[in-house]
């Protein structure tokens, strides 16, 4: 209807806030919009500016300032280099809100009918969202796949061998010219090896018989193969990986993680915590390398910094990854946290 053009109305009880902002805006030469540096922040800033006269003749006095951290340097730089409201970001946020409603208004009544209109624990109204509805579908498909799975059983033969005062683990991989079956050889549909002619399946009697035969045998290392490998560090935190790590290490929910991150951001300890980016500024990289050299020594510094420049499709490119704010990379102890 009407080309999906949304109609925005003032939240009940907030008229006085808008009236106050309008009154104050008339007393200044410039209005600086410093809402959060993401799509939602851009849209909020745009709607505030609209209410204050952004699209009238004096719209040029409305300037957008963006910063990813509450530090003196970041805020000062943003104030010295104001920009314009990014209408592409505003349109992107608006499209997402419209899609939320197109999906939610259609699916939520079905959710209420089939499950419940409210959460049985919190008693909050339930709704079906654009993202979580698809996620639930993926979970259902995965559960159906799990239920179709047919388990199988097999035995491994493991040993601890010793040589020159040292020990190392060993595993039986071949028997009578055939490869000993492992989990990767089984079909999830049958619970049996996919190619029973190519592998030998150890059952318990066979495995125990082999143990009895080999217990007193001597073994010879026929060859040694050495391989180099590199273990790359994980990329810097973005919102999703921060939530995952906080859950794995601290057992925090996504909501609790974001609540703590919001407080750290507002206190000037970390950069903005809602980001898809793994990019770090040159200032941050220099600060991190300086701290490593100071604390651990130059031998622990890589010859050149590792850059994570590629972004996921649709990522909010202007953002940095989540990192300690400022250019000193102080520890929690140094900050008194």
Q: Language-model segments: what does each one mean?
A:
Residues 1-337:
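Toprim catalytic domain recognition across nucleic-acid enzymes
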